[in-house]
From Swiss-Prot:
Localization of this protein: Cytoplasm
Cystine connections: none
Cross-referenced InterPro entries: GrpE (IPR000740), GrpE_coiled_coil (IPR013805), GrpE_head (IPR009012)
Source species: Thermoplasma acidophilum (strain ATCC 25905 / DSM 1728 / JCM 9062 / NBRC 15155 / AMRC-C165)
Keyword Manganese appears in the UniProt entry: no
Keyword Cytoplasm appears in the UniProt entry: yes
MF (Gene Ontology): adenyl-nucleotide exchange factor activity; protein homodimerization activity; protein-folding chaperone binding; unfolded protein binding
GO cellular component labels: cytoplasm
CDD domains xref list: GrpE
Protein name in the entry: Protein GrpE
Subunit field text: Homodimer.
Length: 175
Protein backbone atom coordinates (compact mmCIF):
# COMPACT_ATOMS: atom_id res chain seq x y z
CA UNK A 1 0.00 0.00 0.00
CA UNK A 2 1.10 3.48 -0.79
CA UNK A 3 1.50 6.14 1.83
CA UNK A 4 -0.84 9.09 1.70
CA UNK A 5 0.66 12.52 0.95
CA UNK A 6 0.43 13.56 4.59
CA UNK A 7 2.14 10.34 5.69
CA UNK A 8 4.70 10.72 2.94
CA UNK A 9 5.56 14.23 4.20
CA UNK A 10 6.23 12.82 7.67
CA UNK A 11 8.72 10.16 6.72
CA UNK A 12 12.15 10.49 8.33
CA UNK A 13 13.82 11.15 4.99
CA UNK A 14 11.35 13.89 4.18
CA UNK A 15 11.68 15.41 7.63
CA UNK A 16 15.46 15.40 7.31
CA UNK A 17 15.22 16.95 3.83
CA UNK A 18 12.97 19.67 5.22
CA UNK A 19 15.35 20.35 8.10
CA UNK A 20 18.30 20.39 5.71
CA UNK A 21 16.44 22.84 3.48
CA UNK A 22 15.73 25.10 6.47
CA UNK A 23 19.37 24.92 7.60
CA UNK A 24 20.55 25.73 4.08
CA UNK A 25 18.07 28.57 3.92
CA UNK A 26 19.43 29.98 7.18
CA UNK A 27 23.01 29.55 5.97
CA UNK A 28 22.14 31.31 2.72
CA UNK A 29 20.41 34.09 4.65
CA UNK A 30 23.49 34.49 6.85
CA UNK A 31 25.73 34.47 3.79
CA UNK A 32 23.45 36.99 2.08
CA UNK A 33 23.36 39.23 5.18
CA UNK A 34 27.15 38.96 5.52
CA UNK A 35 27.62 39.82 1.85
CA UNK A 36 25.15 42.69 2.21
CA UNK A 37 27.08 44.01 5.26
CA UNK A 38 30.42 43.72 3.45
CA UNK A 39 28.96 45.48 0.41
CA UNK A 40 27.64 48.29 2.60
CA UNK A 41 31.03 48.60 4.34
CA UNK A 42 32.77 48.69 0.95
CA UNK A 43 30.42 51.45 -0.24
CA UNK A 44 31.12 53.44 2.93
CA UNK A 45 34.86 52.99 2.46
CA UNK A 46 34.60 54.02 -1.20
CA UNK A 47 32.59 57.08 -0.18
CA UNK A 48 35.15 58.06 2.48
CA UNK A 49 38.07 57.52 0.11
CA UNK A 50 36.32 59.51 -2.62
CA UNK A 51 35.70 62.38 -0.20
CA UNK A 52 39.32 62.29 0.96
CA UNK A 53 40.51 62.22 -2.65
CA UNK A 54 38.31 65.17 -3.62
CA UNK A 55 39.52 67.17 -0.60
CA UNK A 56 43.15 66.45 -1.43
CA UNK A 57 42.56 67.27 -5.09
CA UNK A 58 40.95 70.60 -4.14
CA UNK A 59 43.82 71.34 -1.77
CA UNK A 60 46.38 70.65 -4.51
CA UNK A 61 44.43 72.80 -6.99
CA UNK A 62 44.28 75.66 -4.46
CA UNK A 63 48.00 75.31 -3.79
CA UNK A 64 48.71 75.46 -7.53
CA UNK A 65 46.51 78.57 -7.90
CA UNK A 66 48.28 80.28 -4.98
CA UNK A 67 51.70 79.45 -6.40
CA UNK A 68 50.63 80.63 -9.88
CA UNK A 69 49.49 83.95 -8.35
CA UNK A 70 52.77 84.26 -6.46
CA UNK A 71 54.75 83.60 -9.65
CA UNK A 72 52.64 86.20 -11.49
CA UNK A 73 53.26 88.75 -8.74
CA UNK A 74 56.97 87.95 -8.78
CA UNK A 75 57.06 88.46 -12.54
CA UNK A 76 55.16 91.74 -12.24
CA UNK A 77 57.39 93.10 -9.51
CA UNK A 78 60.68 91.51 -10.55
CA UNK A 79 61.88 94.82 -11.95
CA UNK A 80 60.85 96.83 -8.88
CA UNK A 81 64.39 97.30 -7.55
CA UNK A 82 65.75 98.24 -10.97
CA UNK A 83 62.92 100.72 -11.55
CA UNK A 84 63.44 102.22 -8.08
CA UNK A 85 67.09 102.78 -9.00
CA UNK A 86 65.95 104.78 -12.06
CA UNK A 87 63.83 107.20 -10.00
CA UNK A 88 66.75 109.47 -8.98
CA UNK A 89 67.75 109.69 -12.66
CA UNK A 90 64.20 110.77 -13.56
CA UNK A 91 64.28 113.26 -10.66
CA UNK A 92 67.53 114.73 -12.00
CA UNK A 93 66.08 115.06 -15.49
CA UNK A 94 62.95 116.74 -14.05
CA UNK A 95 65.15 119.14 -12.04
CA UNK A 96 67.18 119.98 -15.16
CA UNK A 97 63.97 120.63 -17.10
CA UNK A 98 62.77 122.95 -14.31
CA UNK A 99 66.07 124.85 -14.41
CA UNK A 100 66.10 125.34 -18.17
CA UNK A 101 63.12 124.42 -20.33
CA UNK A 102 65.21 122.26 -22.66
CA UNK A 103 63.06 120.43 -25.23
CA UNK A 104 65.76 117.79 -25.72
CA UNK A 105 65.63 116.91 -22.03
CA UNK A 106 61.83 116.76 -22.17
CA UNK A 107 62.02 114.33 -25.11
CA UNK A 108 64.63 112.20 -23.30
CA UNK A 109 62.48 112.11 -20.14
CA UNK A 110 59.35 111.24 -22.14
CA UNK A 111 61.22 108.53 -24.04
CA UNK A 112 62.59 107.10 -20.81
CA UNK A 113 59.12 107.15 -19.20
CA UNK A 114 57.75 105.42 -22.31
CA UNK A 115 60.27 102.60 -21.96
CA UNK A 116 59.75 102.28 -18.21
CA UNK A 117 55.95 102.31 -18.61
CA UNK A 118 56.21 99.06 -20.59
CA UNK A 119 57.47 97.51 -17.36
CA UNK A 120 54.54 98.90 -15.36
CA UNK A 121 56.01 102.21 -14.12
CA UNK A 122 53.60 105.15 -14.30
CA UNK A 123 53.89 108.69 -12.87
CA UNK A 124 51.29 109.73 -10.30
CA UNK A 125 49.23 112.79 -11.30
CA UNK A 126 49.42 115.07 -8.29
CA UNK A 127 49.10 118.80 -9.06
CA UNK A 128 45.47 119.90 -9.17
CA UNK A 129 44.14 116.57 -7.88
CA UNK A 130 42.47 115.82 -4.55
CA UNK A 131 44.92 114.80 -1.83
CA UNK A 132 45.14 111.00 -1.46
CA UNK A 133 47.25 109.75 1.47
CA UNK A 134 48.00 106.52 -0.41
CA UNK A 135 49.51 108.41 -3.35
CA UNK A 136 50.73 111.68 -1.81
CA UNK A 137 53.02 112.63 1.06
CA UNK A 138 52.50 116.13 2.48
CA UNK A 139 55.73 118.11 2.78
CA UNK A 140 54.06 121.51 3.13
CA UNK A 141 50.73 123.36 3.31
CA UNK A 142 49.41 126.57 1.80
CA UNK A 143 46.18 128.55 2.24
CA UNK A 144 46.02 129.57 -1.42
CA UNK A 145 43.44 127.45 -3.30
CA UNK A 146 40.70 124.91 -2.74
CA UNK A 147 40.89 123.02 0.56
CA UNK A 148 42.16 119.42 0.32
CA UNK A 149 43.66 119.86 -3.15
CA UNK A 150 47.30 119.36 -4.12
CA UNK A 151 48.71 122.79 -5.01
CA UNK A 152 52.30 121.85 -5.97
CA UNK A 153 54.23 118.69 -6.61
CA UNK A 154 57.71 118.88 -5.06
CA UNK A 155 58.81 115.39 -6.17
CA UNK A 156 56.96 113.14 -8.59
CA UNK A 157 55.65 109.80 -7.34
CA UNK A 158 55.28 106.60 -9.33
CA UNK A 159 53.17 103.47 -9.35
CA UNK A 160 54.33 100.03 -10.43
CA UNK A 161 51.65 97.65 -11.66
CA UNK A 162 48.92 99.43 -9.69
CA UNK A 163 50.97 99.51 -6.47
CA UNK A 164 52.68 102.64 -5.17
CA UNK A 165 56.43 102.54 -5.79
CA UNK A 166 57.03 106.01 -4.36
CA UNK A 167 54.52 108.59 -3.13
CA UNK A 168 54.47 112.09 -4.59
CA UNK A 169 55.88 114.76 -2.25
CA UNK A 170 53.27 117.54 -2.35
CA UNK A 171 52.16 120.85 -0.92
CA UNK A 172 48.46 120.74 0.00
CA UNK A 173 45.88 123.50 0.43
CA UNK A 174 44.64 123.68 4.01
CA UNK A 175 42.40 126.43 5.35
Amino acid sequence: MQPTPSEYARTPVRIEMQRSKERNSMVYKEMYNDAQRKYSEALDRISKLTDAYLREKAEVENFIKIKDREVEMSKKNANEKLLKDFLPVLDSIDAAIQAEKDNNLIRIRDQMLGVLSRYGLKPIKAEGSKFDPYLHEVVGVTADGEDGMVKYEVQRGYTLNDGVLRTSKVIVVKR
